[in-house]
Amino acid sequence: FLNAMRAPMTRDRYQTRVSKFFDFVKIPGKTLEQKARHFANKGKNDTNWALSNILKFIYFQRERVEKKEITGATVVNYVKSIKLFCEMADIPIQWKKITRGLPRGKKYADDRIPTMEELKKLIEYPDRRIKAIVYTMASSGIRVGAWDYLRWSHIRPIEKNGEVIAAKMVVYAGEDDEYFTFISPSAWVELADWMKYRETSGESVNGDSYVMRNLWDTRVAQGRGLATLPKKLTSLGVKRLMERAIWAQGLRKKLEPGKKRHPFQANHSLRKWFKTRCEIAGMRPINIEKLMNHSVGISDSYYRATEQELLQDYLHAIEYLSINGNEIKLNKEIEELKEKS
């Protein structure tokens, strides 16, 4: 069941939902694995029993929707998780009987993107990794799950006249859904500084080094201690770091009664921020979708923009994607005035 999901965060969510289902229908077993085997064995021998338990669980969740305790989308996600488990366990279930009466979930969230002021406050959080993470996600539009695969060799600076104008980043390298996007010069600087800091602290950094890793005790002399034993910071670790930073910086407060969503999501909001800022900058919509690895319908088979063409369009958005975009724009205007004078 878990092997059907590549991303650790996805596995964790599906596992949690299935576990709640097993607990609700009182499946015996001390561990999730024991409960899963029990349900799978009994479900294959008695599909009516399996269907009855699933319907009972879904009916309970629908009542919670009516009470405004959860959203319809939450119920849909429960069904997806249980359905995947049953398919992997070869339990034949008539899913039309279950899905026909499901409450409809929104196809989009009604949250917003963070403001420039909020992002500037976020990167003040006292963790050496936060700037590199925020700058990278905001200027590339990658999903938080991409950090599970991102190694140092997957990011390469692009120079013009001896100056870094952007950096190319290969996302999900070696996987079926591998693609490339770009990051801003400021994101490249933050990442390079972070990798340099790790190297001077004693870590043997190379192309295979994961871009994000755990922190270490800086009180230990350089070249010694846990700095030399890097442990990859998974996408779940990045997610938790971002959430800690948002709370610590006063950008998130306890939800008011009746509200289920915070103003903006901790990680996915940066992907939305990227798309919005690129649109404001005037990038071609199809190029934005390409850099986000979104499907563009039939154009997937016919639209073949070159890397250079995508880069040129992306460069138009650099000043809009930089957290210090106002400063960059001001510096650009100053340089233009100097040239005219």
For each predicted feature, which ranges?
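N-terminal core-binding DNA-recognition domain of tyrosine recombinases/integrases
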Residues: 1-9, 18-109
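Flexible interdomain linker/hinge and immediately adjacent N-terminus
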Residues: 38-44, 91-121, 172-176, 217-226
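Basic, Lys/Arg- and aromatic-enriched nucleic-acid-binding interface segment
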Residues: 116-145, 271
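Short, charged phosphate-coordinating catalytic segments
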Residues: 137-164, 283-290
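Conserved tyrosine-mediated DNA breakage-rejoining catalytic core shared by Y-recombinases
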Residues: 149-208
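Catalytic-site neighborhood detector that most strongly recognizes the C-terminal catalytic loop/helix
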Residues: 173, 292-338
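Active-site/catalytic core of tyrosine-dependent DNA strand-transfer enzymes
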Residues: 185-261
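Short, basic (Lys/Arg/His-rich) helix/loop patches that form interaction surfaces
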Residues: 204, 239-290, 294-295
